Regions:
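Positively charged n-region of N-terminal signal peptides that target proteins for export
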Residues: 1-4
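Exported/periplasmic ABC-transporter solute-binding proteins
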Residues: 21-51, 55-74, 81-84, 88-105, ...
Length: 255
């Protein structure tokens, strides 16, 4: 009987520990502009390390695509956009947690070419017959594409380059087109250019050529993890996160 009791106790303790170990972690879903992929992945891991039992699930795409997902009911806790338009649209539909929205980062718009290509050194070189294709994000859903559209209009190159434009689903697709040599050049963020060893920056667009490139962040009203979402949002504004973002080429928001 004693052996049986000991075995039963051992089994009970084992089951308790198994159940405890299998307890699901708090999962936080963060949808963010794909231009933040490397830096936000590092920041999310830092957050997990300082918040035991929390798992951050990252969903990267163009800000416009993420906006549509949220509007269609995707279970998202935190949204970080590469443009104001997408965040404004969600705000106007009362989909954001009141008081949670804030500007996080700024970026710079640049023209990149494959690293070994030397025929483009200035913006005017895009008009050359040797330049056949220029990749930009689709301005309807990609903030970088909208900024590119504004910049080309500002520099009075829209008409001259219209037939050369190749539209991409997001800014990283633009980068991939340039890296592979499928296009002669592309317009991306400075952070995208920094993330690649296969491209070089041929031109930096002046800030006045387009709307300010600001990344707003907010908690979604539908979040079922509001406390953890608030903590993650606060962490995005921390010095620890700022160091990762600056390392990736982002700039803190101008006061």
């Amino acid at each position: 009987m004693k052996k049986l009791s000991s075995l039963s106790l051992l089994l009970a303790v084992s089951l308790f520990h198994t159940a405890f170990a299998a307890e699901p972690a708090t999962e936080l879903t963060v949808s963010a502009a794909i231009s933040m992929k490397e830096s936000l992945t590092a920041v999310a891991r830092d957050f997990e390390n300082s918040h035991a039992g929390t798992k951050v699930l990252l969903n990267f795409a163009s800000s416009g695509a993420l906006q549509k997902q949220i509007e269609n009911g995707a279970p998202v806790d935190v949204f970080v956009s590469a443009g104001m338009k997408e965040m404004n649209a969600l705000d106007q539909q009362s989909l954001l947690e009141p008081g949670s929205r804030g500007d996080l980062l700024e970026n710079t718009l640049v023209l990149v070419t494959p690293k070994e290509v030397e025929k483009i050194h200035a913006l005017g070189d895009l008009q050359s017959d040797d330049v056949k294709r220029l990749a930009v994000g689709d301005p309807k859903s990609v903030p970088a594409g909208l900024y590119a559209q504004q910049a080309l209009k500002f520099t009075q190159l829209t008409a001259a380059l219209q037939s050369k434009l190749v539209l991409a689903e997001n800014v990283r697709q633009v980068l991939a087109y340039v890296e592979s040599g499928n296009v002669d050049a592309g317009i991306v963020y400075a952070t995208d250019a920094q993330a690649s060893s296969k491209v070089r920056v041929a031109f930096v667009f002046p800030a006045e050529s387009h709307e300010p490139i600001v990344y707003p962040a907010a908690v979604l009203k539908a979040s079922k993890q509001e406390k953890t979402a608030d903590e993650f949002l606060a962490f995005l504004h921390s010095e620890t996160a700022k160091q990762e973002f600056v390392k990736a080429g982002f700039q803190p928001v101008s006061k």
